Design a protein with these regions (language model features):
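Enriched but not universal
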Residues: 1-46
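Glycine-rich strand-loop-strand elements at beta-sheet edges
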Residues: 23, 28-35, 39, 49-132
Length: 135
């Protein structure tokens, strides 16, 4: 289950606090990036940004040479980084680009080389950018 998330909370003169979140991971392969347009009356936002966690190693079974298969449990992946900013100044009508980082890939259980079992991928970056292009 993916738990990466980005959450905005907006407030400003005459604007009742609202929040919006994005949980589907973005990456260059699926080209799934988000945009958010600052509503009228909003002059500041709070953002909680969580990066994708690292992948874990898989459980593996192997023959240790004694004709008995050994099973080793997998290990959990690393946690994604988190940052929180309570007051980002924005301009009504401004567009923010958003990327929700993907979780890392798991280690390779199909390899006979034990070091590949733990060779899991790192998690993706999550970010917020003003205008410009994604990536």
């Amino acid at each position: 289950m993916l738990v990466q998330q980005m959450l905005f909370m907006a407030s400003g003169d005459g604007f009742a606090g609202e929040q919006e979140s994005w949980t589907n991971p973005s990456n260059a392969t699926n080209n799934l990036f988000y945009t958010w347009t600052v509503p009228a009356g909003v002059t500041a936002i709070s953002a909680v940004v969580v990066g994708g966690g690292g992948g874990g190693s898989p459980a593996v079974s192997f023959n240790d040479g004694s004709d008995e298969y050994q099973t080793r449990p997998g290990a959990g992946g690393g946690g994604g980084g988190l940052t929180y900013n309570n007051s980002i100044t924005v301009t009504p009508g401004e567009t923010l680009n958003i990327c929700v980082g993907c979780g890392g890939s798991r280690g390779n259980s199909n390899s006979s080389d034990q070091k590949d079992w733990a060779n899991a991928g790192y998690g993706g970056h999550s970010w917020i950018k003003r205008g410009g292009t994604n990536g």
